[in-house]
Amino acid sequence: MPSTPLPDDVETLKALLQQRDEELQSLRQTVSTLELALSVRTLEIEQLTLQIAKLNRMMFGRKSEKIDKKLEQLETRLEDLIAEEGADEQIDPVAAPPRQKSVHKPFPENLPREERIIEPQEDACPQCGGNLKPLGEDVSEQLEIIESAFKVIRNVRTKKACACCDCIVQAPAPSRPIQRGFAGPGLLANIAVSKFADHQPLYRQAMIHARRGVELDPATTGRWMGACGVLITPLVEALHRYVVASGKIHTDDTPMPVLAPGNGKTKTGRLWVYVRDDRNSGSEEAPAAWFAYSANRQGLHPQSHLAGFAGVLQADAYAGYNKIFIDGSVIEAACWAHARRKIYDLHAKKVTPTTKEILRRIGELYAIEAQIRGQPPDERKRIRQLQTRPLIDDLEVWLRNRLLTLSTQSETTKAINYMLNQWHALIYYCDNGLAEIDNNIAENQLRGCCLGRKNFLFLGADSGGERAAAMYSLIGTAKLNGIDPEAYLRYVFTYIADHPINRIDELLPWNITEKLVGQIH
């Protein structure tokens, strides 16, 4: 672009310089304003992210519509702020303020690739007209999604007749997951995962399918899920046997509203989870999660679920477990996360020297666990005896001394007494390298169920709770083993009807990983 000729007159030049100085100053002020706005927005995003994380921690395990509403508001605001950044870049990529570049992991190798060769439009050099020769190429990848599509599989069984007699031959009809049902195994797996993993009620799924021109009545898909629950019963029982054969089990439970028959009101059922997962102590045995439903929270249910189990039971301080520990074959290990949460809730309301100090000391215990994660049990026990035990002994003395200075009616006193009342179970993990510092392994398995409870509002009947527990068992175990639950259920629904019942263990997730190559996370 040619430069504008400068005038010869000195006064005119001075005026021009003055004008440009003023324009430059204005631009600097604009840049400063934009930088300030960007800083404010970046700070707001960081604050929103922290608040959302905090509310997520607070939301689990308690009923709070205020927290849910606040969380939704913050997430919506955060989405809007991030969307504004994307809109700014889309409108003017050059003028958009710089931001920290997102680093994404390479796309999985098993994803299909569609290569598009983009050739230059020029056939000859645009400057001199010379011939063009290959120089190299620039490659960029874009992630796209292809809409899942329905298809109809027509099984045509031809008949053949003997030319010499009346004999007719025909291949047997292929088995179906559901007798006289028209749903294929892939469709059944998709419906099950959409409901129990993605928390989409059947009526919402019906609306989604209707947009694609396929009418699937929720009553029909509901019957399919009932039939699938029966189909997978032997497999879920095998999973149960595998879990209770472990030397350590993590357990937890959560309420499940259930529609009471006759009066239209809801009662409170219970969903229990029992997890076998020793990977933190270096085990290569497959992790597994078995869920069970009960109509109430009576202690007889976990006693029945754990019949035949001997080992360490990591749980909260629920009194319903007490009878399990009586004969000594099952040893109680408590959860430091539960104990810490009671202190943290008080600390979040009002920071005090007591709550601050307790959280700091518990943080030291967790720091040691982070260092020994994945080590064999003997090494974990050695480090805990050397480093953790002195800290815990000192913490106990400090807590008991602190109680002498606190009101017996204070919330802090109650939280400290909660810890001291189960102190033996809390410190047990120091003496057993297989045990964990907390019960988060079980709590994590229940998070998805809590999301589903929020979407479904209630279960239709106790039988619905039992079906949900069965599906949660297979889906949760598939996830623990890094397997796509939909791919796993598709395989199960394809073969389980014809699979020998005495070899049902062959269909457990870790036994079919080689058959699901490309679908392991």
Indicate residue ranges for each PLM-predicted region.
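Short, flexible loop/hinge motifs at secondary-structure junctions
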Residues: 1-182, 250-251, 257, 285-288, ...
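Catalytic center-proximal scaffold of phosphoryl-transfer enzymes
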Residues: 3, 18, 25, 46-47, ...
